[in-house]
Structures are given as structure tokens and as C-alpha cells.
């Protein structure tokens, strides 16, 4: 994929759907080099549809939103044509709409599948070397290993967010997006 030694990771559509979370995970991958993000056209298409239907974004706005992954991780694209053909995705998830995500994780050699979706069969994916986890769990552990790097990263994300926002607003958004333990650790570290 990109050639880094970092573990490969898939952001499920529910994570890409959250701009604050997918940008945070992207910054962790790109800035701290803790992950090597992989994606597929199928994943981007699913997220685009959800953004148009649920957030009522225009097609163009949704395309720009999901364009973050190919723009920042061009080597992370995984072609799913015939990928993981020997694997029955129905044995990996309860949701047929997530079959392509399972194929992406296996075909790309991903170590992590970041999601809040409980429909994935964790033990079945683990047999393929894929750990299904919420971003919060990964971020908390990674923060403990590199707190200064995370504080710098969060300051940059807050500065870039909508023309610059206070760090407290960014952490509140991260918490609302499902990474409350991580946001709490960062608040303490920032003295908020």
C-alpha cells in the first residue's frame, strides 16, 4: 500500500461519515505515522450515499468529504475486483451491506477495522488478522505512548477546523463522535 511500517487500517463508513473522526484518524496516520489507511471505491460510494441521504449534503459536497482519503492516502486504494474471493463475507458480518468492508480489510492485509458498528463478527475477522475496534480504544492507547505528538496534532486540527476553533470545541466534537475517553485524556493533558 504506502510502504510505511505502520499497521494498515480501514475506516468503516460510519467513521468516514464523521468528519472530525476521519480527519483525526487521518492525521494520526499521516502526521504521527501510526497507521497506514486503506480504502476502496465501494467504501467511498457507501459513505457518499449516506452523506447525501442522512446529512442531506449535495453530491459535490459528499464527494469532497470522502475525497479526503484518496487525496491524502492515494496509495491506500485497494481494488476489490475478485478480492478475498475465497472468503465468505456473510461469515464475517451480519450486515450484507458491509461485505465489501470485510473484503477490503482482508484483501488489504489490514490489522484494524475501525467502526462503531456492532454487526461485525469480531472473532471471525480476528481469524483473518483483523481487529475490529472503535477509534476511541486505539486513540487512548496511542495517546499514552505519544502524548506530546497528539497534543500538537490536536492543536493543528483545531486551528484548521472551520477557520480555527478553540481546542475545547474540537474535543467536544470528538467526544460526540464516540471518542469520549480519548477526548477526556486530551482535556486533562491540556489542563481544560
What are these regions (language model features)?
Residues 1-25:
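Metal-dependent nucleic-acid phosphoesterase active-site entry motif
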Residues 19-54:
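PIN/NYN-family metal-dependent endoribonuclease catalytic core
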Residues 74-112, 165-166, 176-192:
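Active-site neighborhoods of divalent-metal-dependent phosphate/nucleic-acid chemistry enzymes
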Residues 118-192:
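Acidic, PIN/NYN-like endoribonuclease modules and their adjacent C-terminal/linker elements
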Residues 33, 109-110, 129:
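Residue-level detector of structured alpha->beta connecting loops
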Residues 45, 49-74, 137, 144-161:
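Extended, non-globular alpha-helical segments
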Amino acid at each position: 500500500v504506502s510502504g510505511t511500517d505502520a499497521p494498515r487500517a480501514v475506516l468503516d463508513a460510519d467513521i468516514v461519515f464523521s468528519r472530525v473522526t476521519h480527519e483525526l484518524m487521518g492525521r494520526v496516520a499521516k502526521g504521527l505515522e501510526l497507521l497506514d489507511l486503506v480504502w476502496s471505491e465501494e467504501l467511498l460510494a457507501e459513505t457518499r450515499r449516506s452523506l447525501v441521504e442522512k446529512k442531506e449534503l449535495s453530491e459535490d459536497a459528499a464527494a469532497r468529504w470522502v475525497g479526503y482519503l484518496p487525496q491524502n492516502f492515494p496509495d491506500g486504494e485497494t481494488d476489490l475486483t475478485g478480492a478475498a474471493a475465497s472468503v465468505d463475507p456473510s461469515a464475517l458480518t451480519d450486515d450484507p451491506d458491509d461485505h465489501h468492508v470485510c473484503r477490503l480489510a482482508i484483501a488489504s492485509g489490514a490489522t484494524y477495522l475501525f467502526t462503531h458498528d456492532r454487526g461485525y463478527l469480531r472473532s471471525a475477522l480476528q481469524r483473518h488478522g483483523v481487529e475490529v475496534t472503535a477509534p476511541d480504544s486505539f486513540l487512548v492507547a496511542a495517546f499514552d505512548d505519544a502524548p506530546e505528538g497528539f497534543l500538537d496534532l490536536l492543536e493543528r486540527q483545531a486551528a484548521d477546523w472551520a477557520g480555527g476553533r478553540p481546542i475545547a470545541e474540537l474535543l467536544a466534537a470528538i467526544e460526540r463522535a464516540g471518542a469520549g475517553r480519548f477526548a477526556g485524556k486530551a482535556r486533562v493533558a491540556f489542563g481544560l
